[in-house]
């Protein structure tokens, strides 16, 4: 009997877990993967920018660094860049109780070039116009700076340039498991033989997201689910 489900949604949001655990199968806790994260936005920011993309940017966390884009939501952040960095963000939340995503809002400029550009006289320009003209920062990117930085930093050229290149964005939690594209956790490989059959339940095979592994992207997820499903099916 082959068994393959969406780990978070299959059989009523992971209800298969206690069914197998009761039979002695070792299962790692299911965790959201390729998921969004909660951020404590101000009401003004959330109402104005929810649904807007932030691009191009570079995100970094725990030594990992990647360029891409993401979307602002009413409750936080989601999108390709966030999904790619979801594992280290989740791990930081689990081990440290907090996590910070650092953003480079001007990936096309070095810190030195950005500092020089922002040091040019503003004249009668507002801060918003100065950021737009000298740094290419406007819209939601400018909104993020105002949301996350104290006024003193916004008005100090060197500090502002450094913040644009390394803006700290605290995240408070993963989105719920049933919103995640995929999951980490699942049936431990030690519970399976080389044919993906449960050692304690002969004739029962596991595949797909039921297995304890984590896909870096949706594409890898589908490929591995198809591959493990086929491998298990060959022994049924």
Predicted regions and their residues:
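Short hydrophobic core segments
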Residues: 1-9, 20-21, 70-75, 204-206, ...
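Glycine-rich loop(s) and the adjacent beta-strand/alpha-helix scaffold that form part
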Residues: 1-43
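Glycine-rich phosphate/pyrophosphate-binding beta-alpha loops
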Residues: 6-7, 36, 78, 182, ...
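Conserved mid-sequence domains
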Residues: 10-11, 198, 208, 214-215, ...
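An active-site-proximal "capping" alpha-helix that borders the catalytic cofactor pocket
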Residues: 16-24, 223-236
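Acidic, Ser/Thr/Pro-rich intrinsically disordered regulatory segments
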Residues: 38-69
């Amino acid at each position: 009997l082959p068994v393959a489900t969406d780990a978070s949604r299959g059989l009523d949001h992971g209800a298969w877990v206690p069914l197998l655990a009761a039979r002695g199968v070792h299962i790692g806790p299911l965790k959201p993967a390729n998921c969004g994260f909660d951020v404590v936005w101000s009401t003004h920011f959330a109402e104005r920018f929810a649904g807007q993309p932030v691009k191009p940017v570079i995100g970094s966390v725990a030594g990992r660094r990647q360029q891409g884009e993401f979307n602002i939501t009413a409750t936080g952040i989601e999108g390709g860049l966030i999904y790619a960095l979801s594992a280290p963000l989740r791990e930081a939340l689990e081990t440290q109780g907090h996590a910070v995503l650092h953003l480079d809002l001007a990936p096309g400029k070095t810190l030195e070039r950005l500092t020089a550009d922002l040091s040019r006289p503003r004249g009668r320009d507002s801060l918003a116009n100065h950021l737009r003209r000298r740094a290419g920062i406007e819209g939601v990117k400018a909104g993020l700076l105002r949301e996350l930085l104290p006024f003193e930093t916004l008005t100090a050229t060197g500090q502002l340039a450094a913040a644009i290149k390394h803006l700290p964005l605290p995240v408070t939690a993963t989105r719920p498991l049933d919103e995640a594209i995929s999951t980490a956790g699942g049936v431990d490989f030690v519970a399976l033989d080389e044919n993906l059959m449960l050692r304690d339940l002969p004739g029962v095979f596991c595949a797909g997201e039921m297995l304890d592994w984590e896909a870096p992207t949706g594409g890898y997820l589908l490929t591995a689910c198809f591959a493990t499903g086929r491998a298990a099916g060959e022994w049924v």
